Design a protein with these regions (language model features):
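Non-catalytic scaffold segments within catalytic domains of secreted glycoside hydrolases
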Residues: 1-162
Length: 162
């Protein structure tokens, strides 16, 4: 048995308060930094805290991160490449936090990147690109993005560092 967690973005934050429990949960402000998808606030600490809290609260022995990734405003450059530095930054920071959790004993046994290739998203259609491979939807030509190279390195070394 295992639990699968989809981890993308923080949805709220906690502040001290005079309330009985000593804290208050507030929604993320609209000005909070986000990726090209407005709903995808940048919060790599979620990759640390979500599995850590889930393991502690539910006494989990095996966790898989079943989805994590980001959209990006990917553009093919004149040299035929996609330099998606924002996605590399997102993945590097989230995976570093996940690595921190596993180093502390959180039982994360696997990670599934969303997504391998650009695809049709239910809400946004073909407008938002989540893949580490660029897809030309007219020709179906697949081109690895900079993030594909980074993620290949992550897999090869089993580490989030560059």
């Amino acid at each position: 048995d295992f639990v699968g967690l989809n981890i993308y973005a923080p949805q709220a934050y906690v502040v001290a308060s005079d309330r009985a429990q000593g804290f208050e949960v507030l929604p993320m402000p609209s000005s909070f930094p986000h990726m090209s998808s407005p709903w995808l606030q940048i919060g790599p600490e979620t990759a640390y805290w979500v599995p850590k809290l889930a393991a502690n609260i539910w006494n989990l022995k095996t966790i898989y991160i079943t989805e994590n990734g980001t959209s990006s405003d990917d553009k093919m450059t004149a040299d035929g490449k996609v330099h998606d530095l924002d996605r590399v930054m997102y993945l590097r920071n989230y995976l570093a936090q996940l690595q921190r959790a596993t180093a502390e004993g959180v039982p994360v046994k696997g990670y599934f990147l969303w997504s391998l290739m650009d695809n049709f998203e239910w809400v946004f259609g073909y407008k938002q690109r989540f893949g580490v491979y660029h897809i030309d939807f007219d020709t179906q030509v697949r081109t690895p993005k900079l993030s594909a190279s980074y993620y290949r390195h992550v897999i090869t070394t089993n580490a989030a560092s560059a």
